[in-house]
A protein has these predicted regions:
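Short S/T/G/P-enriched beta-strand
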Residues: 2-4, 8-13, 40, 48-99, ...
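Major-groove recognition helix of helix-turn-helix-like DNA-binding domains
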Residues: 105
Length: 201
């Protein structure tokens, strides 16, 4: 007599040989079953008009295999919080979220100091959220997210100068004859609070 198993509670795919014939003792053995998605499951065994539902059992995550930026870092001014918050996901081979996994960010391209809480644990959805990041120096940057042996590089983003807080003569006026051009040219420099030049002001 053939017996067929189906996944009757919970999501995912019940893989393996799901139909087996009973042996001389009336027992059908299913030795290669697997389910790809986590959660509480039941399987139903069917033989002709007969059915029976198994006890509930739980599928848990396998090891972390994939790391991705969900919310990429956005452009920001020097010293300002990068918003919206940067988020990173950790999943297993089947896309199941991995919770409780530490993720660390570092500045992998560009100069400056990446400030904020640089290590966060993933939540129940497999997401690590970095809500207080900032960088002090201007330019094009990339972040790298690291979780164990996994790593991923963010899209490029740009840090621009903050509001000017310092003004100084970088080229003082020189003595000159009345009516003559003062040379060399007089120059004035504007810097923000982090020492970045402020352009277009």
């Amino acid at each position: 007599q053939n017996v067929t198993l189906t996944l009757s509670t919970g999501t995912g795919v019940l893989a393996g040989t799901v139909t087996q014939a009973t042996n001389a003792s009336g027992v059908a053995t299913f030795a290669d079953l697997s389910i790809n998605l986590v959660g509480v499951k039941n399987v139903t065994a069917t033989a002709g008009a007969l059915t029976v539902v198994s006890n509930a059992f739980t599928i848990t995550v396998s090891g972390a295999t994939t790391i991705n930026f969900v919310q990429q870092p956005s452009n920001a001014s020097a010293g300002a919080t990068i918003a919206p918050a940067v988020t990173v996901s950790i999943t297993d081979t089947f896309g199941n979220p991995i919770s409780g996994q530490n993720v660390t960010l570092n500045l992998s391209t560009g100069t400056g100091v990446l400030s904020g809480t640089l290590t966060q644990a993933t939540d129940g959805s497999g997401i690590a959220t970095f809500a207080d990041l900032s960088i002090n120096l201007i330019g094009v940057k990339n972040l790298t997210a690291i979780a164990g042996a996994l790593n991923v590089v963010s899209n490029a983003f740009t840090i621009t100068s903050a509001t000017a807080t310092n003004i100084s003569f970088s080229g003082q006026p020189s003595n000159a004859v009345a009516g003559a051009t003062i040379a060399p040219a007089v120059t004035v420099t504007l810097l923000d609070g982090f020492g970045n030049p402020v352009s277009g002001q």
